[in-house]
């Protein structure tokens, strides 16, 4: 996607027809759904027009069906196909995914008002609204795992969004929706239609309420067959189309390269990266063996507390900014876990004060607030920015919940060799094969280099957290402070400080000098409060070594083309922030599902970016 300005929400007028509030776009001068009955029109045009009742009911085990939509609007089409999915889906781990684009998203309050028109959809609408993202550019993945349903809501101009989408799975059915071509001609231009076709394949179907010439000509130019059955209500026609197979095979075949049976995956490394990969695979119905030579969370992932504290970028960079995208996904992901608690983080403006505080004016309201130093509950000379949607995770509680998943098994042993042979991956310990899987994901940070000679070099960064008894808390338990380090309550009468930062050090013993370092950090910004803390000799601590890539982007993807070996590593000090989205990216890649980030960002994460070919350390055998 190209650099764009911040997302503007839709400006609406409302018309009341038969007691139903119908939203009307002031920008485009058109209604969002039919005044006759928008839900019935959606079913007639988009669901029946794509033969979705039969196609969804006939999905094979583990099959992945993808719907594309050109205008999210009120989300009515999404809820209608979701409702249909509930009614006809087979009990076989098949999955329905929707990709939708919206340039002017409704505000959350307007969305709630618009969807009140459909009482039969209210339960689904509430679930959608609960996860409805902030109006920030980029891809927002909304997962509903119990429903085997997911949505990628791309906020931005269709001209920018569609070219940036990675074609890892072709769209099976298109909802060509949006305002009428006469009201919004840009959405129906040739450039957009070309991208829609790029994301499609033989057997893809298309449906639209519009039979405008620009749409028909654009589809026909690509060899897509068009018919014009009767439209909804008073409309004489609608558009129904299909991209026929070259040899005229059955056009009801759904394209895709998903596994047709349950797969078995080995995940090497039981830190935060490995736990997230295991969870993402198990949630899709696949069996996972999580392997580590030590107990889970023995490395850098095992601190007593993890703070989600992203440094947000200028709003114009959000669409492709990894940290912003990860933060938005993580806060939705962790809300499904008892280990998570939503908090506020007060980020002190230590440098470039004006530029940091100006972020509050760029982001949607309720995300950020700027405050003067005088407003701080802790005496300081620094102004600060309050991030309202930060969070705290208890790593051990999170780990326990992941390992309770019935499809995840943990085994403790050291891996000495990996053999990729006959389409499977075998893990060996002391020259004995102890585990065979369909594929393996390497998540063992710097230890990965012991298995792969040309595995990208990850630099060590030592970090130590400190905690101690403290009975004076002039700030609320749902608040944290960030100032190069951080401080917050660990327990009702304990304060935790983090963390020292020592690049190129791999020692992990608790050191008094690092306690002093953490004290000096908090003393530099809150000198009066720091004087109330107990002596550093009474502090407790935990030291560990993080792994960071040379360019600070994680390693996410396939280690070598056509290999069954993948990796997620190099998360640095942002493991709990980065892991949810990056594991989702990786698992989607492995299973051939839609990618939740742009092609540009995906390339930045590719572990092969540092080398032309991964050379595996002997003894490693491939055939």
From Swiss-Prot:
Region of interest: tRNA (mnm(5)s(2)U34)-methyltransferase: 1-244
NCBIfam families according to UniProt: MnmC_Cterm, tRNA_MNMC2
InterPro entries registered for this protein in UniProt: FAD-dep_OxRdtase, FAD/NAD-bd_sf, MnmC-like_methylTransf, SAM-dependent_MTases_sf, tRNA_MAMT_biosynth_bifunc_MnmC, tRNA_MNMC2, tRNA_S-uridine_synth_MnmC_C
Keywords for this protein: Cytoplasm, FAD, Flavoprotein, Methyltransferase, Multifunctional enzyme, Oxidoreductase, S-adenosyl-L-methionine, Transferase, tRNA processing
Organism of derivation: Acinetobacter baylyi (strain ATCC 33305 / BD413 / ADP1)
GO BP terms: methylation; tRNA wobble base modification
GO molecular function, one term: oxidoreductase activity, acting on the CH-NH group of donors
Protein name, entry field: tRNA 5-methylaminomethyl-2-thiouridine biosynthesis bifunctional protein MnmC
Function as written in the Swiss-Prot or TrEMBL entry: Catalyzes the last two steps in the biosynthesis of 5-methylaminomethyl-2-thiouridine (mnm(5)s(2)U) at the wobble position (U34) in tRNA. Catalyzes the FAD-dependent demodification of cmnm(5)s(2)U34 to nm(5)s(2)U34, followed by the transfer of a methyl group from S-adenosyl-L-methionine to nm(5)s(2)U34, to form mnm(5)s(2)U34.
EC number: 2.1.1.61, 1.5.-.-
Catalyses which reaction(s): 5-aminomethyl-2-thiouridine(34) in tRNA + S-adenosyl-L-methionine = 5-methylaminomethyl-2-thiouridine(34) in tRNA + S-adenosyl-L-homocysteine + H(+)
Subcellular location: Cytoplasm
Cofactors (names): FAD
């Amino acid at each position: 996607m190209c650099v764009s300005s911040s997302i503007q929400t839709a400006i609406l007028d409302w018309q009341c027809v038969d007691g139903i509030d119908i939203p009307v776009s002031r920008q485009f001068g058109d209604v969002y759904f039919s005044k006759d009955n928008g839900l019935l029109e959606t079913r007639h045009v988009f669901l029946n027009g794509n033969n979705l009742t039969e196609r969804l009911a006939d999905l094979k085990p583990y099959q992945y069906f993808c719907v594309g939509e050109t205008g999210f609007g009120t989300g009515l089409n999404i809820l209608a196909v979701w409702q249909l999915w509930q009614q006809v889906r087979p009990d076989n781990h098949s999955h329905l995914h929707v990709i939708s684009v919206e340039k002017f998203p409704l505000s959350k309050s307007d969305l709630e008002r618009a969807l009140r028109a459909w009482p039969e959809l209210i339960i689904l609408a509430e679930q959608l609204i609960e996860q409805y993202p902030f109006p920030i550019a980029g891809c927002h993945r909304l997962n509903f795992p119990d429903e085997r349903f997911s949505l990628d809501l791309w906020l931005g101009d269709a001209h920018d969004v569609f070219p940036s989408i990675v074609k890892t799975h072709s769209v099976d059915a298109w909802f060509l929706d949006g305002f009428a071509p006469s009201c919004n001609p840009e959405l129906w231009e040739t450039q957009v239609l070309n991208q829609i076709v790029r994301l499609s394949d033989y057997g893809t179907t298309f449906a639209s309420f519009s039979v405008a010439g620009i749409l028909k000509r654009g589809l026909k130019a690509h060899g897509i067959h068009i018919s014009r059955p009767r439209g909804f209500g008073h409309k004489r026609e609608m558009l129904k189309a299909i991209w026929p197979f070259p040899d005229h095979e059955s056009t009801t075949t759904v394209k895709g390269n998903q596994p047709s049976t349950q797969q078995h995956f080995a995940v090497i490394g039981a830190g935060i990266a490995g736990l997230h990969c295991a969870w993402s695979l198990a949630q899709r119905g696949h069996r996972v063996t999580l392997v580590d030579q030590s107990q889970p969370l023995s490395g850098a992932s095992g601190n007593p507390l993890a703070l989600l504290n992203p440094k947000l970028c200028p709003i114009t960079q959000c669409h492709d900014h990894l940290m912003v995208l990860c933060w938005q996904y993580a806060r939705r992901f962790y809300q499904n876990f008892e280990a998570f608690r939503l908090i506020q983080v007060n980020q002190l403006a230590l440098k470039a004060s004006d530029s940091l505080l100006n972020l509050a004016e760029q982001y949607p309201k309720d995300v950020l607030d700027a405050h003067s130093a005088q407003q701080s509950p802790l005496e300081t000379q620094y102004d600060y920015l309050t991030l309202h949607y930060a969070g705290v995770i208890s790593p051990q509680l999170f780990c326990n919940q992941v390992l309770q998943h019935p499809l995840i098994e943990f085994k403790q042993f050291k891996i000495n060799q990996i053999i990729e042979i006959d389409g499977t991956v075998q893990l060996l310990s002391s020259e004995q094969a102890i585990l065979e899987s369909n594929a393996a994901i390497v998540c063992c940070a710097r230890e990965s280099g012991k298995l792969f000679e040309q595995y990208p070099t990850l630099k060590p960064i030592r970090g130590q957290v400190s905690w101690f008894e403290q009975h004076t808390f002039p700030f609320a338990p749902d608040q944290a402070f960030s100032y190069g380090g951080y401080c917050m309550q660990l327990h009702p009468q304990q304060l935790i400080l983090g963390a020292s930062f020592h690049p190129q050090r791999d020692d992990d013993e608790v050191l008094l000098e690092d306690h002093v370092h953490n004290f000096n950090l908090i003393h530099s910004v809150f000198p009066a409060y720091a004087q109330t803390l107990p002596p550093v000799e009474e502090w407790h601590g935990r030291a560990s070594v993080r792994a960071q890539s040379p360019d600070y982007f994680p390693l996410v993807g396939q280690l070598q083309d056509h290999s069954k070996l993948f990796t997620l590593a190099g998360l640095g000090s942002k493991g709990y922030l980065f892991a949810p989205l990056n594991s989702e990216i990786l698992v989607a890649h492995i299973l051939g599902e839609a990618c939740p980030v742009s092609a540009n960002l995906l390339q930045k994460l590719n572990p092969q970016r540092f080398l032309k070919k991964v050379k595996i350390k002997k003894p490693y055998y491939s055939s």
